[in-house]
Structures are given as structure tokens and as C-alpha cells.
Regions:
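Mid-to-C-terminal functional-domain signal that highlights helix-capping/loop sites
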Residues: 1-233
Length: 233
């Protein structure tokens, strides 16, 4: 930041979202946005780098020579043995509840932004409909789960100035993502592995698996993908 490297540690939690403090200036930074909220660097934002929400199985498959960071030998003693999700669910959220909401505060969503437009895709809808095809702003979007049902990625559906319509072809082993125009097959990395478009790659888009209350707090004007959701609150 500004030509120097900052070193961070956990300073606290705001609405169940980490607040980090840098040792160099004492500025506090919000985890979800990477932006400074209090201190000399308030208003500045860290550059976002690509990240992945995948299981180690998927990561190892795509990066067979990967290294693994070994945890400190005494790290376990700093963590409670109880189920973290059940433990954290005891604490209230501070996000105002809209009676018109069709999602509960702790429902999981996939959050995606395109320019100034944000949209939340309920995890239950993705599991039921995988993949989800949508358009967000000017971006034709693919929201995709791997066959493990846990690993998540999002892609721009445009290839060579053409927008692809993609679907999951079952009845083959393993199932494959196929575009309806050319019949090309695509893997979870976004690479076309067979067909006329073999070798082409879909552009990755950042997406975040998050709780609804957290996503809505920091994206108050977010839209919600409602196809397949039950009606009512």
C-alpha cells in the first residue's frame, strides 16, 4: 500500500466479519471489502487478488505439484473443538431483517458483482439447478458447482464475442458442462476439453460464498436470484 508492505493481525469482529489492524499505521481494515475503515489510511482499499473456493481434492487435481502450508504444532490449542457453525449461530446478527426477504440471515449465498451491480445466488438454488445461467449487468454469467457439491466458481460465458448457453449433460461419466451451439465440453476450470472450441477458456469472475446477512450488509442494493425459491418469506 503506497509502496510499503503492511503486516496484519486480527483486531476484532464487526457483525461477525473480521476487522484487521496493520502494524505499520494502526489502521483498521474490513475483511469483506479489504477497505480501511478507521485510521490514517481510512478510505484506502487493498488490491483484490484472485481466490478459489474449492476443496483440496479439486485443488490437488488441478495443481498436482502443489505445496501445503503446515500449521504450527501448537495451533490446535487456540481453537475450540466444538462445531464452529453451531457455536457461531448462537450469536445474533445486526443486519436489519426485511419482512419481504425470502432468505434467512444465515442462508448461504454466492455473491457476484459486475460493475456497480451486485447479486446473490442462494446456495440451495445452485445445488438444485447447477449450473445457473444468468446475466448480471452486461455480463453473461455462469455459476458452477463441481461434482463434489462444494467447490464453486463463476465464469463469463462469452467466448470469441459469442455468448454460450451452457448446461450440465448427465448420463455420461463424468457429467460434463456442454454449450448448446457447438456441443463443446467444458471442465470445472473453464477449459473446453472437447469439441470445436477445445482449448478455449472461459474468463473467471470473482464470486464469494457468504452468509446472506453479511452479503446484504456490504451490498445493500443487491439483487437476489429467485428462480426456484419458495414464495413468501
Amino acid at each position: 500500500m503506497g509502496g510499503r508492505t503492511l503486516h496484519f493481525h486480527l483486531a476484532g469482529i464487526n457483525n461477525q466479519n473480521f476487522i484487521m489492524s496493520d502494524e505499520e499505521t494502526g489502521t483498521w481494515w474490513q475483511q469483506v471489502s479489504g477497505c480501511a475503515v478507521v485510521g490514517p489510511l481510512a478510505g484506502r482499499c487493498l488490491e483484490t487478488i484472485p481466490w478459489d473456493e474449492v476443496t483440496f481434492e479439486v485443488w490437488k487435481r488441478e495443481h498436482p505439484n502443489t505445496l501445503v502450508l503446515r500449521p504450527a504444532a501448537d495451533a490446535r490449542e487456540h481453537y475450540a473443538a466444538a462445531d464452529w457453525e453451531k457455536e457461531i449461530a448462537r450469536y445474533p446478527t445486526v443486519t436489519p431483517i426485511d419482512p419481504q426477504d425470502r432468505l434467512q440471515p444465515r442462508d448461504l449465498v454466492v455473491g457476484v458483482t459486475s460493475g456497480t451491480v451486485a447479486k446473490a445466488y442462494p446456495w440451495t438454488a445452485l445445488v438444485a439447478q447447477n449450473p445457473i445461467i444468468d446475466t448480471l449487468g452486461d455480463t453473461p454469467l455462469l455459476v458452477l458447482l463441481d461434482l463434489d457439491g462444494r467447490s464453486l466458481r463463476c465464469f463469463d460465458r462469452r467466448v470469441a464475442n459469442e455468448t454460450l448457453d451452457l448446461f450440465l449433460r448427465t448420463g455420461i461419466c463424468p457429467p460434463a458442462i456442454v454449450d448448446s451451439r457447438t456441443g463443446s465440453e467444458w471442465d470445472f476450470s473453464g477449459l473446453a476439453t472437447a469439441g470445436p472450441l477445445a482449448g478455449r477458456r472461459l474468463a473467471r469472475l470473482p464470486c464469494l460464498k457468504d452468509y446472506w446477512f453479511d452479503w446484504k450488509t456490504y451490498n445493500p442494493n443487491t439483487r437476489v436470484f429467485t428462480a426456484g425459491l419458495p414464495s413468501g418469506s
